[in-house]
Regions:
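Terminal and domain-boundary accessory regions
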Residues: 1-205
């Protein structure tokens, strides 16, 4: 049995949240647009995507920020929003919505998110996943095993425990809503889009 001197136990260093953020290195952000949209609805806020990007980066070096969403190419408001996103720091990954038998529309981008997270391992030190979808837990865990830090940002009530369990850090959107909500009307409004033109695949529990 390994005997560790008592004074060595007392010398274990405890890092503050600020010190943890300082060690994030290069950051890559992966945003599940549909999941974030529904979280914002639950919180009763409108997301300011400039503030969101700043908050998620938190002063670290940003490699790239991906935004994944289903699209209706006939919806001019949504196209305008996505154009704004592309011009303001986001790489937009989109997929055409498919109409389901019940009349709703859906575009599942879990595969795209997982593939991009894995493909870029080695280029970033910290992956920030904005989603509560448990289907992404395996990809997040795989990224972690390959040496990257994983942070999950989502609304707790919409987040799978399996995703939280594989994360190095979890941030509840409810705790940072004051920092990321829109306070002016200068930007294109995401909440103006009808739910039918957005990916309606809610997070799995």
């Amino acid at each position: 049995m390994l005997n560790i001197p008592e004074n060595q136990h007392n010398s274990i260093e405890i890092f503050t949240p600020d010190q943890v953020l300082e060690n994030r290195g290069r950051v890559a952000i992966f945003i599940d647009g549909s999941n974030l949209f529904y979280a914002a609805l639950q919180l009763g806020i409108e997301i300011d995507y400039t503030k969101l990007l700043c908050r998620l980066t938190a002063g670290s070096r940003l490699l790239r920020s991906f935004f994944y969403t289903g699209v209706d190419r006939t919806n001019e408001k949504q196209q305008g929003f996505l154009l704004w996103m592309r011009r303001n720091g986001y790489r937009v990954i989109s997929k055409d919505l498919v109409q389901l038998p019940d009349g709703s529309k859906k575009a599942n981008l879990d595969v795209e998110i997982a593939v991009d997270m894995m493909a870029l391992v080695g280029s970033y030190d910290t992956a920030v996943l904005v989603s509560g979808d448990g289907d992404l837990a395996y990809a997040a865990d795989s990224v972690s095993y390959r040496g990257a830090r994983v942070e999950v940002v989502s609304l707790r009530s919409m987040t799978s425990d399996s995703l939280i369990n594989v994360a190095d850090r979890y941030v509840d959107l409810d705790q940072i809503k004051e920092e990321i909500q829109k306070t002016s009307k200068h930007h294109v409004s995401y909440n103006n889009f009808p739910v039918s033109v957005l990916d309606q695949d809610r997070s799995s529990r």
